[in-house]
Protein backbone atom coordinates (compact mmCIF):
# COMPACT_ATOMS: atom_id res chain seq x y z
CA UNK A 1 0.00 0.00 0.00
CA UNK A 2 1.35 3.42 -0.98
CA UNK A 3 1.35 5.77 2.01
CA UNK A 4 0.88 9.50 1.48
CA UNK A 5 3.29 11.72 3.42
CA UNK A 6 5.72 8.97 4.33
CA UNK A 7 9.06 7.66 3.17
CA UNK A 8 8.80 4.08 1.96
CA UNK A 9 10.66 1.49 -0.08
CA UNK A 10 8.85 0.61 -3.33
CA UNK A 11 9.75 -1.63 -6.24
CA UNK A 12 10.20 -0.41 -9.81
CA UNK A 13 7.38 -1.92 -11.91
CA UNK A 14 7.48 0.10 -15.12
CA UNK A 15 9.96 2.33 -16.96
CA UNK A 16 8.88 5.16 -19.28
CA UNK A 17 10.69 8.02 -21.02
CA UNK A 18 9.22 10.53 -18.52
CA UNK A 19 10.06 8.49 -15.43
CA UNK A 20 9.37 5.22 -13.69
CA UNK A 21 6.45 3.75 -11.77
CA UNK A 22 7.07 2.30 -8.33
CA UNK A 23 4.76 0.13 -6.23
CA UNK A 24 3.01 -2.88 -7.74
CA UNK A 25 0.75 -3.55 -10.72
CA UNK A 26 -2.39 -2.78 -8.70
CA UNK A 27 -1.13 0.41 -7.05
CA UNK A 28 1.74 2.44 -8.40
CA UNK A 29 2.98 6.02 -8.40
CA UNK A 30 5.16 7.99 -10.80
CA UNK A 31 8.72 8.93 -9.94
CA UNK A 32 9.62 11.66 -12.49
CA UNK A 33 12.69 11.08 -14.61
CA UNK A 34 14.76 13.80 -12.93
CA UNK A 35 14.58 11.89 -9.64
CA UNK A 36 15.39 8.45 -11.06
CA UNK A 37 18.86 7.17 -10.08
CA UNK A 38 21.06 6.29 -13.04
CA UNK A 39 20.98 2.62 -13.98
CA UNK A 40 17.62 1.90 -12.33
CA UNK A 41 15.97 -1.30 -13.59
CA UNK A 42 12.62 -3.05 -13.20
CA UNK A 43 12.56 -4.91 -9.90
CA UNK A 44 14.90 -2.49 -8.13
CA UNK A 45 13.84 -1.13 -4.75
CA UNK A 46 13.94 2.62 -4.12
CA UNK A 47 13.24 4.71 -1.04
CA UNK A 48 10.83 7.48 -2.02
CA UNK A 49 8.59 10.06 -0.38
CA UNK A 50 5.01 10.27 -1.67
CA UNK A 51 3.08 13.54 -1.84
CA UNK A 52 0.75 15.33 -4.28
CA UNK A 53 1.85 17.51 -7.19
CA UNK A 54 0.30 20.83 -8.27
CA UNK A 55 -2.51 18.86 -9.98
CA UNK A 56 -3.21 16.91 -6.76
CA UNK A 57 -1.90 13.67 -8.28
CA UNK A 58 0.14 11.28 -6.16
CA UNK A 59 3.81 11.68 -7.03
CA UNK A 60 7.03 10.18 -5.69
CA UNK A 61 10.36 11.87 -5.09
CA UNK A 62 13.79 10.85 -3.89
CA UNK A 63 14.31 14.34 -2.46
CA UNK A 64 14.37 14.62 1.32
CA UNK A 65 11.38 16.46 2.86
CA UNK A 66 11.94 18.55 5.98
CA UNK A 67 9.30 16.48 7.79
CA UNK A 68 7.09 13.46 7.21
CA UNK A 69 3.57 12.65 8.36
CA UNK A 70 3.10 13.41 12.06
CA UNK A 71 6.54 14.94 12.47
CA UNK A 72 7.25 18.49 13.68
CA UNK A 73 9.70 20.84 12.00
CA UNK A 74 10.68 24.50 11.89
CA UNK A 75 9.75 25.72 8.40
CA UNK A 76 10.22 29.08 6.70
CA UNK A 77 7.32 30.99 5.13
CA UNK A 78 7.95 31.67 1.42
CA UNK A 79 4.78 33.58 0.60
CA UNK A 80 1.27 34.43 1.77
CA UNK A 81 -1.78 33.75 -0.40
CA UNK A 82 -5.56 33.93 -0.16
CA UNK A 83 -5.76 30.39 1.21
CA UNK A 84 -2.87 30.50 3.64
CA UNK A 85 0.91 30.55 3.81
CA UNK A 86 3.26 28.44 1.72
CA UNK A 87 6.24 26.90 3.47
CA UNK A 88 9.59 25.71 2.17
CA UNK A 89 9.97 22.05 3.13
CA UNK A 90 12.65 20.99 0.66
CA UNK A 91 10.37 19.75 -2.14
CA UNK A 92 9.43 21.20 -5.51
CA UNK A 93 5.87 21.96 -4.39
CA UNK A 94 5.65 24.19 -1.31
CA UNK A 95 3.63 23.08 1.72
CA UNK A 96 0.36 24.87 2.51
CA UNK A 97 -0.29 26.19 6.01
CA UNK A 98 -4.03 27.06 5.93
CA UNK A 99 -5.20 30.13 7.82
CA UNK A 100 -7.33 27.98 10.14
CA UNK A 101 -4.20 26.07 11.20
CA UNK A 102 -2.23 29.21 12.12
CA UNK A 103 -1.98 30.11 15.80
CA UNK A 104 -0.28 33.47 15.19
CA UNK A 105 0.02 35.73 12.17
CA UNK A 106 2.92 34.44 10.09
CA UNK A 107 5.26 36.53 7.97
CA UNK A 108 7.37 35.75 4.88
CA UNK A 109 10.97 34.96 5.75
CA UNK A 110 10.13 33.89 9.31
CA UNK A 111 10.19 30.28 10.52
CA UNK A 112 7.50 28.57 12.58
CA UNK A 113 7.05 25.12 14.16
CA UNK A 114 4.51 23.00 12.27
CA UNK A 115 3.39 19.39 11.99
CA UNK A 116 2.50 17.55 8.78
CA UNK A 117 -1.02 16.11 8.49
CA UNK A 118 -3.52 14.94 5.85
CA UNK A 119 -6.59 17.17 5.52
CA UNK A 120 -10.16 16.13 4.65
CA UNK A 121 -9.36 16.45 0.93
CA UNK A 122 -6.52 13.90 1.30
CA UNK A 123 -3.87 16.58 0.79
CA UNK A 124 -0.74 17.14 2.85
CA UNK A 125 -0.89 20.35 4.87
CA UNK A 126 0.90 21.97 7.78
CA UNK A 127 -0.55 22.95 11.15
CA UNK A 128 0.81 25.12 13.93
CA UNK A 129 -1.50 23.35 16.39
CA UNK A 130 1.17 20.83 17.36
CA UNK A 131 0.18 20.04 20.97
CA UNK A 132 -1.38 16.69 20.07
CA UNK A 133 1.69 15.67 18.04
CA UNK A 134 4.02 15.89 21.04
CA UNK A 135 4.94 12.88 23.17
CA UNK A 136 5.45 12.47 26.92
CA UNK A 137 8.06 9.69 26.90
CA UNK A 138 11.17 11.84 26.70
CA UNK A 139 14.50 10.42 27.92
CA UNK A 140 15.24 13.53 29.99
CA UNK A 141 15.54 13.72 33.77
CA UNK A 142 15.86 16.58 36.25
CA UNK A 143 18.68 19.08 35.50
CA UNK A 144 19.17 17.80 31.94
CA UNK A 145 19.78 20.54 29.37
CA UNK A 146 17.46 20.49 26.35
CA UNK A 147 16.95 22.25 23.03
CA UNK A 148 13.47 23.29 21.98
CA UNK A 149 11.24 25.51 19.87
CA UNK A 150 8.57 27.84 21.28
CA UNK A 151 5.16 26.93 19.82
CA UNK A 152 2.82 28.90 22.09
CA UNK A 153 3.09 31.85 24.47
CA UNK A 154 0.38 32.18 27.14
CA UNK A 155 0.78 35.26 29.38
CA UNK A 156 -1.12 33.52 32.19
CA UNK A 157 0.60 30.13 32.06
CA UNK A 158 4.00 30.49 30.45
CA UNK A 159 5.88 29.46 27.32
CA UNK A 160 5.15 26.11 25.66
CA UNK A 161 8.13 24.38 24.07
CA UNK A 162 8.49 21.47 21.65
CA UNK A 163 11.55 19.74 23.11
CA UNK A 164 13.65 18.22 20.31
CA UNK A 165 10.58 18.80 18.15
CA UNK A 166 9.07 15.72 19.82
CA UNK A 167 8.23 16.15 23.50
CA UNK A 168 5.99 18.28 25.71
CA UNK A 169 7.78 21.04 27.59
CA UNK A 170 6.74 24.26 29.31
CA UNK A 171 8.49 27.18 30.95
CA UNK A 172 6.06 28.21 33.72
CA UNK A 173 5.21 31.89 34.04
CA UNK A 174 7.36 32.18 37.18
CA UNK A 175 10.42 31.08 35.19
CA UNK A 176 9.83 33.34 32.18
CA UNK A 177 12.11 36.35 31.92
CA UNK A 178 12.14 38.43 28.75
CA UNK A 179 10.01 38.27 25.62
CA UNK A 180 9.36 35.19 23.48
CA UNK A 181 7.68 34.60 20.14
CA UNK A 182 6.47 31.47 18.40
CA UNK A 183 9.40 29.96 16.53
CA UNK A 184 12.11 31.05 18.97
CA UNK A 185 14.77 28.44 19.68
CA UNK A 186 15.57 27.98 23.36
CA UNK A 187 18.04 26.11 25.50
CA UNK A 188 16.62 25.23 28.89
CA UNK A 189 17.06 23.03 31.94
CA UNK A 190 14.59 20.41 33.11
CA UNK A 191 13.53 21.37 36.63
CA UNK A 192 10.78 18.78 37.01
CA UNK A 193 9.40 15.78 35.15
CA UNK A 194 5.67 15.67 35.85
CA UNK A 195 3.77 12.45 36.53
CA UNK A 196 2.28 12.64 33.03
CA UNK A 197 5.78 12.85 31.51
CA UNK A 198 5.65 16.51 30.52
CA UNK A 199 8.76 18.56 31.22
CA UNK A 200 8.82 21.69 33.36
CA UNK A 201 11.66 23.90 32.18
CA UNK A 202 13.78 26.84 33.26
CA UNK A 203 16.02 29.04 31.14
CA UNK A 204 18.42 29.26 34.04
CA UNK A 205 21.10 26.81 35.07
CA UNK A 206 21.41 25.47 38.61
CA UNK A 207 22.13 28.25 41.12
CA UNK A 208 25.78 27.35 41.59
CA UNK A 209 26.38 27.65 37.83
CA UNK A 210 24.03 30.55 37.13
CA UNK A 211 25.30 32.97 39.75
CA UNK A 212 28.44 33.96 37.81
CA UNK A 213 26.36 34.67 34.70
CA UNK A 214 23.91 36.78 36.70
CA UNK A 215 26.77 38.68 38.32
CA UNK A 216 28.16 39.45 34.86
CA UNK A 217 24.75 40.78 33.80
CA UNK A 218 24.62 43.04 36.87
CA UNK A 219 28.09 44.40 36.06
CA UNK A 220 27.10 45.05 32.44
CA UNK A 221 24.00 46.97 33.53
CA UNK A 222 26.07 48.89 36.08
CA UNK A 223 28.45 49.97 33.34
CA UNK A 224 25.52 51.08 31.17
CA UNK A 225 24.51 53.33 34.09
CA UNK A 226 28.03 54.79 34.28
CA UNK A 227 28.89 52.69 37.31
CA UNK A 228 25.95 53.61 39.55
CA UNK A 229 22.71 51.63 39.57
CA UNK A 230 19.84 53.82 40.85
CA UNK A 231 18.36 50.99 42.91
CA UNK A 232 19.55 48.16 45.16
CA UNK A 233 18.56 44.58 45.90
CA UNK A 234 15.60 46.03 47.83
CA UNK A 235 13.98 47.29 44.60
CA UNK A 236 10.64 45.84 43.50
CA UNK A 237 10.60 42.61 41.46
CA UNK A 238 9.08 44.56 38.56
CA UNK A 239 11.99 47.01 38.40
CA UNK A 240 14.55 44.21 38.58
CA UNK A 241 12.77 42.22 35.88
CA UNK A 242 12.55 45.26 33.61
CA UNK A 243 16.18 46.27 33.98
CA UNK A 244 17.93 42.90 34.22
CA UNK A 245 15.53 40.20 32.99
CA UNK A 246 15.97 38.15 36.16
CA UNK A 247 14.03 37.45 39.32
CA UNK A 248 14.57 39.39 42.53
CA UNK A 249 15.98 36.26 44.20
CA UNK A 250 18.55 35.81 41.42
CA UNK A 251 19.45 39.50 41.59
CA UNK A 252 20.02 39.33 45.35
CA UNK A 253 22.27 36.29 44.93
CA UNK A 254 24.28 38.04 42.22
CA UNK A 255 24.64 41.22 44.31
CA UNK A 256 25.73 39.17 47.31
CA UNK A 257 28.34 37.43 45.18
CA UNK A 258 29.66 40.76 43.85
CA UNK A 259 29.81 42.20 47.37
CA UNK A 260 31.73 39.18 48.57
CA UNK A 261 34.25 39.56 45.77
CA UNK A 262 34.41 43.34 46.47
CA UNK A 263 33.44 44.33 42.94
CA UNK A 264 30.59 46.57 44.10
CA UNK A 265 29.47 48.58 47.10
CA UNK A 266 26.01 49.64 48.26
CA UNK A 267 25.18 53.02 49.73
CA UNK A 268 22.03 55.10 49.94
CA UNK A 269 19.99 52.43 48.17
CA UNK A 270 22.29 52.51 45.16
CA UNK A 271 24.81 50.01 43.84
CA UNK A 272 28.19 51.28 42.69
CA UNK A 273 31.14 49.68 41.01
CA UNK A 274 33.91 49.49 43.59
CA UNK A 275 36.75 51.65 42.28
CA UNK A 276 38.86 51.28 45.42
CA UNK A 277 42.15 49.48 44.89
For each predicted feature, which ranges?
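Single-stranded RNA-binding regions, centering on S1/OB-family and related RNA-binding modules
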Residues: 1-277
